[in-house]
Amino acid sequence: LAESGLANRWSATPFHFYGNSGENFTNARLGGIAKVSTGIVLVGSSAPSMSEKFRKENQQLFIQIVSPVTQKSMLSGSRRKGSSCGSSRTDTGVKWLTNYKDASVTASAVAIMERQQILVLWEKESSAGTESYYMVLSPTGKILQKATRIGKISLNACEEIKYKNGCVYWTTANGKKTASVHKLYIGKFK
């Protein structure tokens, strides 16, 4: 973590993507970044492999919590090896939150709740359509609330979700100049 006046800069590459620099197809999306007492939280979706087979894999939801000081993962998640930008890479502490065989995660988001709890929302896309879900994790990555179905409500991949007083808020648009504000009661966890 580098400090410069009022701003802090953190530089690390804890999660790698298969392929060469400049490739547009990564089969992955960053959902968001947040800070908790145990480190920097990364939430996103990706094909689990760092090999050519990633092109045929469904995107799964993942979380990493990385120390801004040591740049090491704070989770005891899985380890994955492969190639990224022409070099051999190893990602450690990747906790996969989904394992869909017939669906993909198409969007995800993260917010921090009271007591440093991590709120994760995502969209699951399958042949039956798109549905959204949420789960709550502790600052150490322990699942406090298992995947809970929200329904056929989209997330906004271009805007962060907001959490306040037990509720999460986000907006979507239907393409007809109409915006919808969504409010979901999550509650507070001990």
Predicted region positions:
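Extracellular, repeat-based ectodomains that mediate carbohydrate processing or recognition
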Residues: 1-190
